[in-house]
A protein has these predicted regions:
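Outer-membrane beta-barrel channels and translocator barrels
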Residues: 91-95, 149-153, 191-195, 258-262, ...
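Outer-membrane beta-barrel "beta-signal"
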Residues: 461-473
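Transmembrane beta-strands of outer-membrane beta-barrel pores
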Residues: 61-67, 104-108, 148, 162-166, ...
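Long, internal scaffold/assembly segments composed of regular secondary structure
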Residues: 230-353
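N-terminal, post-signal peptide beta-strand-biased segments of exported outer-membrane/organellar beta-barrel
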Residues: 17-110, 123
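Membrane-embedded beta-strand positions of outer-membrane beta-barrel proteins
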Residues: 57-61, 100-102, 158-160, 186, ...
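Short, flexible helix-coil linker/hinge segments at the edges of structured domains or between repeats
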Residues: 114-126, 203-245, 277-292
Length: 473
């Protein structure tokens, strides 16, 4: 339902990974819980105008808190986040449209043990020292999308995303970091009057990161990890620096067909292939050396089959997909591979949408498996496992009256994590509630979310809380 889409936007992924927006990842993760339009399938800017028919302006303020009662070695005890999000869409004329988004986010990582990274586990060559302290991050992000119909039903679009973020640790080594990220997508699309749409896009992304750790006390030693088990101790000096250079390219395609086999059936297929390279330099500011270099390449495919329409009583959606990639990493001093990682991820899901007068009830199930073959050759460590996951969810959208809608969600999931979690499985449960009301001047909404992670047979849990306020006109 339309209300469901709006209220989902209002929450804006409060519990997403902290580094999202200041980092670019290959491919994307699909979930049957979400609704995907032509633009969303692969973020093809050529289809932006087909999914937006009215000018729109939204403002959102959100805040979140995560208490890590259960921690990995390099996790903080608590994470506090806050952000402001402004989005605008405007049709310039009958053939072109422009969308912009400005986001400013802050986050505080409290009692972070040794790590000088925002997420130690997201890289094979992470920076640490020997202190525990608080780290604060802040920075803006800007997105601009321009879309135009160049011939009858033939569309093109350009999307540019830019983000910058600064971080500072409050104890020596007083590590200061800055991350600059750019993402550019150019797309073509064709949408026929019969309901068939074809699209292709090319994406280039680039990231540069800089870390500067100042020595003040003798035991504040800086290290560069190579994998998750060994590290290189940097030489004691007044200033240690780390530079990260990453860039990649991805080519995606998509197909959508309404009236597939029967009038109420729609099929959507998306796929892509890409590669990303990362170079890490560390040492003194006058003579940095390469500490590591790693490459990721692979691809994905995803399909969605949707049944529903004006003549149907219920809606049904099936989803299935595959993601596969391979990593190679080598230390800077030697021309050998010391880390190799292969991932094959399969997912599938089903959901049904049942309208009951003024209520829309969605019930769904999702499952998947991640086949991991991770090998560190220097210490001869192998993690070769097939990790399973599952999710059950229910969404309820209620039209209380002509000017007020309410949204309610509850979900339960279980997944088997990587070795650095030190537990065999983690169970999660969450709840989200939101309400939106129409006034003469626009719509005001509020959404609240809670999610709890409980490791198997372990003391403690990870508790997430978030709230968002929005205004739309």
């Amino acid at each position: 339902m339309r209300q469901n889409c709006i209220l989902s936007i209002l929450t804006v992924l409060i519990l997403t990974t902290l580094s999202d927006g200041y980092e670019n990842y290959l491919y994307r993760d699909y979930s049957v819980r979400n609704t995907y339009n032509l633009y969303d399938l692969v973020n093809n800017p050529a289809f932006l105008r087909l999914n937006n028919h009215e000018d729109l302006m939204t403002y959102e303020i959100r805040t979140g808190n995560q208490e890590n009662g259960y921690q990995r070695a390099f996790d903080p005890e608590r994470i506090e986040t806050a952000g402001v999000d402004i989005f605008s869409y405007k049709a310039l004329d009958e053939k072109s449209a422009l969308a912009t988004r400005i986001v400013y986010e802050t986050s505080s990582l409290n009692n972070l043990y040794r790590s000088l990274e925002k997420d130690f586990y997201s890289d094979y060559f992470s920076y640490t020292d020997t202190t525990t302290g608080d780290v604060s991050y802040a920075g803006p992000r800007l997105s601009v999308i321009y879309n135009r119909e160049i011939f009858s039903r033939l569309l093109t679009g350009l999307q540019i995303d830019y983000g910058i973020e600064r971080g500072l640790k409050d104890v020596y080594t007083k590590c200061e970091s800055i991350s600059r990220n750019i993402n550019v997508i150019w797309g073509l699309g064709y949408s026929s009057y019969s309901g068939t749409s074809l699209g292709a896009s090319v994406r280039y992304f680039d990231r540069q990161g800089s870390y500067e750790a100042v020595k003040e006390i003798t035991d504040a030693i800086v290290n560069t990890y190579m994998g998750y088990h060994i590290y290189y101790p940097e030489q004691p000096r007044s200033t240690n620096e780390k530079k990260v250079y990453a860039e990649g390219i991805e080519i995606d395609g998509q197909l959508s067909k309404k009236g597939f086999l029967v009038p109420s059936l729609k099929i959507e297929i998306a796929g892509g292939y890409g590669a990303k390279e990362n170079s890490i330099n560390a040492g003194g500011s006058s003579n940095p050396v390469q500490r590591g270099y790693w490459i990721r390449e692979g691809g994905f495919a995803n399909s969605i089959l949707t049944y529903g329409g004006k003549q149907s009583k219920i809606g049904l959606e099936l989803m299935a997909g595959l993601k596969r990639y391979h990593d190679w990493a080598s230390p800077g001093d030697y021309d050998v591979i010391n880390i190799e990682n292969s991932i094959t991820d399969i997912h599938y899901g089903i959901k049904t949408i049942i309208p009951i007068q003024s209520i829309s009830l969605t019930i769904g199930y999702e499952a998947g498996s991640e086949d991991v073959n991770y090998h560190e050759y220097t210490v001869d460590y192998v993690f070769d496992e097939q990790l399973s996951r599952s999710l059950i969810f229910t969404d309820v959208d209620i039209s209380l009256n002509q000017v007020m809608q309410m949204h309610y969600s509850v979900w339960f999931s279980n997944f088997e994590p990587w070795f650095y979690w030190n537990t065999s499985s983690i169970q999660t449960q969450g709840i989200e509630m939101g309400v939106e009301r129409l006034f003469v001047f626009g719509k005001i909404g509020v959404s609240f979310q809670m999610e709890f992670w409980k490791p198997n047979d372990e003391m403690g849990s990870i508790d997430h809380f978030g709230i968002a306020f929005s205004f739309k006109k």
